[in-house]
Amino acid sequence: MAHKKAGGSSRNGRDSRSKRLGIKKYGGEYVSSGNILVRQRGTKFHPGENVKCGKDYTLYSIIEGIVKFKKRGKLKKKYISVIKLNNLNKKLQNRQISIKY
């Protein structure tokens, strides 16, 4: 007869892999068509000009250009836009936007 009680097995020791969410391209960065700008759960960021939203709320660029972050509306929702390079030069000349490099 055994004099030691059998040790129980642990039920710990597992964890899920991280989902790598967050901003992938920041304001002022150059992006090409199809580049992922943000991976998110829900709409923390909303699509602006030249940006589309995937079925998992991923925001991606539909043209090549420069990324621009904006807050709009009463609730100050965050929008991400991509500005075409030739439009960017005109807007910079008219001082409508500022870009940090």
Curated annotation (Swiss-Prot):
Domain of life where this protein originates: Bacteria
Gene3D superfamilies: 2.40.50.100
PROSITE patterns documented for this protein: RIBOSOMAL_L27 (PS00831)
InterPro entries: Ribosomal_bL27, Ribosomal_bL27_CS
An annotated GO BP: translation
Sequence segments annotated as region (Disordered): 1-21
Keywords: Ribonucleoprotein, Ribosomal protein
Short name of one Pfam family: Ribosomal_L27
Any one annotated GO CC term: cytosolic large ribosomal subunit
One MF annotation (Gene Ontology) recorded for this entry: structural constituent of ribosome
Recorded family membership: Belongs to the bacterial ribosomal protein bL27 family.
Protein's name according to its UniProt entry: Large ribosomal subunit protein bL27
Gene: rpmA
